[in-house]
Amino acid sequence: MEGPEIKAVEAVIDNGSFGKRTLRFETGRLAQQADGAVAAYLDDDSMILSTTTAGSSPKENYDFFPLTVDVEEKMYAAGKIPGSFFRREGRPSSEAILACRIIDRPLRPLFPHTLRNEVQVVETVLAVNPDDAYDVVALNAASASTMISGLPFEGPVSGVRLALIDGQWVAFPRWSERERAVFEIVVAGRVVENGDVAIAMIEAGAGKNAWHLIYDEGQTKPDEEVVAGGLEAAKPFIKVICEAQAELKKIAAKETKEFQLFPEYTEDLYNRIDEIAHADLDEALSIAEKLPRQDRIHEIKEGVKATLAGEFTDMEDAEKDKEIGNAFKELQRQIVRRRILTQDYRIDGRGLRDIRTLSAEVDIVPRVHGSALFQRGETQILGVTTLNMLKMEQQIDALSGPQSKRYMHNYEMPPYSTGETGRVGSPKRREIGHGALAEKALVPVLPSREEFPYAIRQVSEAIGSNGSTSMGSVCASTLSLLAAGVPLKAPVAGIAMGLVSGDVDGQHIYKTLTDILGAEDAFGDMDFKVAGTSEFITALQLDTKLDGIPADILASALQQAKEARTTILEVINECIDGPAEMSPYAPRIITTTVPVDKIGEVIGPKGKMINQIQEDTGAEIAIEDDGTVYISSEGGEAAEKAKEIIDQIANPHVPEAGETYNGKVVKTTSFGAFVNLTPGTDGLLHISQIRNLANGERIDAVEDVLKEGDTVEVVVQGVDDRGKISLAIPGFEDQESSAPRRDRGDRDDRRGGRGRRDDRRRSDDRDDRDYDDRPRRRRSDRDDDRDYDDRPRRRRSDRDDRDYDRDDRRSSRSDRDDRDYDDRPRRRRSDRDDRDYDRDDRRSDRRRGSRRDDRNPRYAADENYDEYRADREERSERPRRRVRRDFDPFED
């Protein structure tokens, strides 16, 4: 789509040796019905659509400006499908919420605070380069769309992210470049009348690799002077982007609309309240304790309402109450600010640089891995640390940037912390922002994964609030982490700075406050939070109610904050000067390495091996792609056992004959049991050996003695050429695992070389048997209906179920009756002759018939039969043929 309605401007960011970045603003193509719509492009590679829309009617019952900023992360922007059940975007991520705060903070002060029409700014991420962050681009797009929307907006305001890389401040750094950043800073500002840039918002922190870069590679340390230099370095980039937005406004802006403004109070009402309550408020605002001060102020306010009950009768009651409240609050604000500007006198009587009473304590919560309580005045923070396996680190489904987070900092502020009631549940935007700031302050001093292979969750409970709970969270977290045994590279402390500005004797002056109260935050012009070690800054955040603050004032505030930070660090070091012994309830994590090609063996098919190790030892195991294995358990003994098993898999020991093992039965078969000796190594315990566990008695099934999961002591009999391991019961090593087959000689043909059947000599002791020695007929001469069956022999139980006449079978078998057939190998004739038994008894036994469990004495002994049968089943499962032959007694 092309045409004169599409208008665009560009801002070129020159980073010298790091190249140029181009920021382009385009309007007229997309979202044409919004009050203001701008598509912002970074190098024509990342694209964000920003829209600004105002409500048609004001919300008269509101006593604040209703501005809403939303960031819509579209997963298609990164070529992804959402991972949720419904496969669509849901609630905003933490990254989106932090981006909303970065946009809201510099935009809000530039609107009239008496505007009551709803204003909504929506940032839709349409495309993003995985190596770029979108938040600062969205900030500039939001300002541009608001500039052309026709709203009363004192812009433009623009922002830039700078990274200190190899001594140079680089604008709009890529994620890959930020790996070598010592310090990162997001600065938003606007160009004032004298051409200078006034700072409106700062969000900054040391890089995650800052400690290594500073102390191992000698990079620049981000102290107060360096950070102040970063603020100055941001000004040229801010000015270039503001100029591009101003040009876009000239060519594409709508005419500014007229919006009704709602003054908070009338001048007459304010003067009357000042006359009635000034002296009482001046006294009440000198009470140091928060709750008694609030109670006294409430009494004064009720007295003012009673006094004015008969005055200003032309106003409706609801409107009158609202204006009285607004005017009364403004009077408090003026009293507090005037005393600071003219007398350097604060609410609780402190000087401008004084810190409230500090206290620190560790190990106050039982059983948790680490805990601490930090208190500064009436601000009270409980820090709790939890350690776990690296596999518990947070996985982030982000459009770009890091996809996981090992250190997770959660900030929570329940309503009782201020003596109020309210909703308790999911975190609000403010809580997410405070947690992210505290996390940013501590990440640079955390040990590396190799030094401390734990996932760390830190929770800051703001159980008492009267100013700067976020910086109190940094202090409490330092104490808690050290109490949990986390080897921090240095302790970190934080302090909140305030600012009051105004005209005194015709001169505009600024007063910087150290360790501000909640009331000073509400009535002041700035909330400037600074955290760091004794040597450099690790985190920085600035919010202001002014259009902008001179950079030299901020530089002075940084130096003042360092003094306070040093004092707090002394208190922390007195409480705990290093990492404590880890809690007995914390997991002990050890590491080992396995060759990459052995990872599959450690995991096993479908995770069978690793799950078995975890089940047997009680340890938890996590394996990295490079072969690093992390093993954890409470107490450490289970972890050591699991490590030993994993090492055996990675460097297996081949069992040798004579070695004894306590193995677990992993499988049973009809011929024996497979026993696990070492991880991944099994051996066969033959059924003939298993009988020794049953006192040598015959067993019908292996499961009668051993079942899967049983533990049995075995000794290695031998290992064949294929690596197959045969096992034995200790004490029976010399016993063969199967009956040996005797030498049957050269069998010549299927008859075994014993000559013709009719020529064989029969023993005289068999003359009384009903045998027929006449020549057999050829098979073709036999009757076609002969009872001949070459099917596999059925089990006896199957045959008995058949409906046939057993008498016919007996008659065809001659004197064999219904004897159970036995296919065991026959003994040699000499063995049978040596037996001392009565042949008549044998015949009578045949006539009586034999039971299933009877053993025919002319066959091998029971134990040899069992061995032969097991060996035969192991070698072959071919069906056995039974051939039935009948003889004609009348044939010559």
Swiss-Prot record:
Stated EC number for the protein is 2.7.7.8
Top-level taxon in the UniProt lineage: Bacteria
Print the keywords alphabetically: Cytoplasm, Magnesium, Metal-binding, Nucleotidyltransferase, RNA-binding, Transferase
A single GO CC term, please? cytosol
Q: Which GO terms describe its biological process?
A: mRNA catabolic process; RNA processing
* Domain KH intervals: 587-646
Instruction: Please give the residue ranges the record annotates as the region Disordered.
Output: 407-427, 727-892
Needs which cofactor?
Mg(2+)
Q: Where is the composition biased (Basic and acidic residues)?
A: 739-844, 851-877
Q: Per the database record, which ranges form the S1 motif domain?
A: 658-730
Family assignment? Belongs to the polyribonucleotide nucleotidyltransferase family.
What does the record give as the function of this protein?
Involved in mRNA degradation. Catalyzes the phosphorolysis of single-stranded polyribonucleotides processively in the 3'- to 5'-direction.
Query: What protein am I looking at?
Result: Polyribonucleotide nucleotidyltransferase
- Organism encoding this protein: Bifidobacterium adolescentis (strain ATCC 15703 / DSM 20083 / NCTC 11814 / E194a)
